[in-house]
Amino acid sequence: MNFEVLFQLTALIFVVAAGPLVIVLLASRSNSGL
């Protein structure tokens, strides 16, 4: 397997997973803050 392709796939998965994760963290932080 090519390392560059594996790196791009890992980066893509990280970006896709980081989107909803950040929203959940912000929502939980705002809820706990209130």
UniProtKB/Swiss-Prot annotation:
Cited InterPro entries: PSII_Ycf12_core-subunit
Membrane topology classification: Single-pass membrane protein
UniProt key word Transmembrane helix: yes
Q: Which organism is it from?
A: Tupiella akineta (Green alga)
Q: List the GO cellular component terms.
A: chloroplast thylakoid membrane; photosystem II
Q: Which HAMAP family match?
A: PSII_Psb30_Ycf12
**Pfam families recorded:** PSII_Ycf12
Q: Where does the record say this protein resides? A: Plastid, Chloroplast thylakoid membrane
Where, by residue number, does the polypeptide cross the bilayer?
5-25
The gene from which this protein is expressed is psb30
Q: What is this protein called?
A: Photosystem II reaction center protein Psb30
Q: Which family does it belong to?
A: Belongs to the Psb30/Ycf12 family.
A biological process term (GO) from this entry: photosynthesis
Q: Carries keyword Thylakoid?
A: yes
Subunit organization:
PSII is composed of 1 copy each of membrane proteins PsbA, PsbB, PsbC, PsbD, PsbE, PsbF, PsbH, PsbI, PsbJ, PsbK, PsbL, PsbM, PsbT, PsbX, PsbY, PsbZ, Psb30/Ycf12, peripheral proteins of the oxygen-evolving complex and a large number of cofactors. It forms dimeric complexes.
Q: What does this protein do?
A: A core subunit of photosystem II (PSII), probably helps stabilize the reaction center.
Sorted alphabetically, the keyword list is: Chloroplast, Membrane, Photosynthesis, Photosystem II, Plastid, Thylakoid, Transmembrane, Transmembrane helix
